[in-house]
Amino acid sequence: MNIVKALIPFVLCGAFAMAAKPPAPHLVVLKDNERLVANTLPTEQQIQDVIRLRGWRGERVSAQVVAWSAVLLCKWGGRLSCSALQAENTETVLQPQCLPVHETMAHGKPVADIVGSPCWRRDVFPGRNMPMAFMVQLDIPADAAPGVYRGTLRLGAAYASGKSYRGVTPSVEVPIELVVEQGVLPPPAEWKFHLDLWQHPQSVARWHKVKPWSPEHFDAMRPYMTMLAQAGQKVITCTLLDEAWNGQTHDDFPSNIEWIKGADGTWRYDFSAFDAWVSFMMNDIGITEQISCYTMVPWHMKVRYLDEATGKYEYIKLDVNSPVWEQTWGPFLTAFRAHLLQKGWLHKTCIALDERPDHMTRAAMAMVHKYAPELRIVSAVNKPTSLTREVYDLSPIITHADTVPEDLLTERKAQGKKTTIYVCLHPQKPNTFTFSPPAEAEWLGLFVAANGLDGFLRWAYNSWNENPLQCTDFGKWPSGDCFLVYPGARSSIRFERLRDGIEDAEKIRILRERAVALGTPEARAAIDKLNAELRAIFTVARSKGNSHGEDVARARELISETTENLFRL
């Protein structure tokens, strides 16, 4: 078989005796819900012998492998090469890529989570029996022919004695089997799953040492936001005022809008940063559905503004029961509405609230209704209340998702409203922390689909600590709570698995739509079976257990079975 050189160089350390013949290195496949524990060899219970992948056309599939050497090697490294995958009776050739998975620290323990570029690190085999993980990943082309594709992952490792090159170890191979199914997943921009991961532009500016909102800043942000768009992101995160969350992140979270009080007491607003950010996300990145603006009810209940009379920054103390409330928000909303109308963004923009009590939420809604009625309300809440019916985009925490009854979900869908779930530092599981079992992230998307919800919200896509490449801890949060991707536009195991869950949800949606379009008893029976089993598995009660890996495996089986049944009708 022609081996395509998708090669990753390894640099290996140590030396053999001159006459020693080195043994072959080791290459194994991690099971789906396993992580490599740094400096620890995987156990028999964690591994399998074959990379088995299955997916629709247009879907991303992946597996983790682990490589190590039982002897200390040095100088030029080994090569991990993946052959092209080919199927019988087709000329289609599919080429996976191999990406190293590097460790970072989480609560004092090394965790392999960072999906890096091949040239990022050089100490692949830093010592005897010190393993390194890789992700074998493939975006199946939308026009690929369905069928079974096979190929090989091969690892060899060079060795040296002193300064002399002495030869290579025997190579070791792992078979790859990919089943490409009949279904076709559309591009992420066309997915219906309502993904809302909050962006943090200032983190990118600080890491890359560029001036906020400069051309260099937007250049630096482009790969991160492109990666987010490729996961199906629908929402642009904006800020109406400084530190809406009262400074809970390592980097500042300033307002996208400058508030200015003139010497004559009138208000004006500088929307230049807001305009640049939204235009970039829409026009350059392609995230166009919703603009969520935080917030009218900040955690600190104050608004920072520039007082032209003194040349100093001052603060307004907000109180929903005080005349200051309307005196502050009336002029702003009037100006904001006019500006959004001019830009063509009025009907995409929402006023966003984060875990605010009902009386504050109602006060914000009253101001919006009076001064900018076209704006809609987004609200992340711990537990739904009587306001549930009124909020356009509602996101309860997953542990209270079952308090939104099915008839209310149906009503909200009919009105074009969104109902999503979120996780944050709670619950402990399922979640997307650095140390979370990988299947938990995928489980979240399946929970959304199984329960007729619209999507998923999480408070931080990239609110990095000082150096997440070294450690993902920050403050009082569980490690990794503040971000899902890493500097250098590096993905993570947890982000990739979250994306897998979104793809699962999209496949379920498409299967449901296909069953309705077919309209046959066989199609109805197939989709009813899928829905019933998913609803039985993906419950709030079950979310608190330890079965996320087996739940995801069963859901994948069900999706494949239903795909086969519906696409042969």
Model region roles, listed by residue range:
Residues 12-23:
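Bacterial Sec-dependent signal peptides at the C-terminal "C-region" and cleavage site
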Residues 70-72, 139-146:
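Short, surface-exposed loop/turn segments at beta-strand-coil junctions that are enriched for proline
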Residues 2-9:
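Sec-dependent signal peptide recognition
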Residues 393-476:
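Catalytic-core region of carbohydrate-active enzymes that cleave or remodel glycosidic bonds
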Residues 302-305, 313, 317-383, 453, ...:
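Catalytic domains of carbohydrate-active enzymes that cleave complex glycans
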Residues 21-47, 60, 67-136:
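Surface-exposed binding patches on compact interaction domains or structured appendages
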Residues 102, 107, 111, 139, ...:
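Aromatic-lined carbohydrate-binding surfaces of glycoside hydrolases
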Residues 53-59:
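Short, solvent-exposed loop/linker segments at the N-terminal edge
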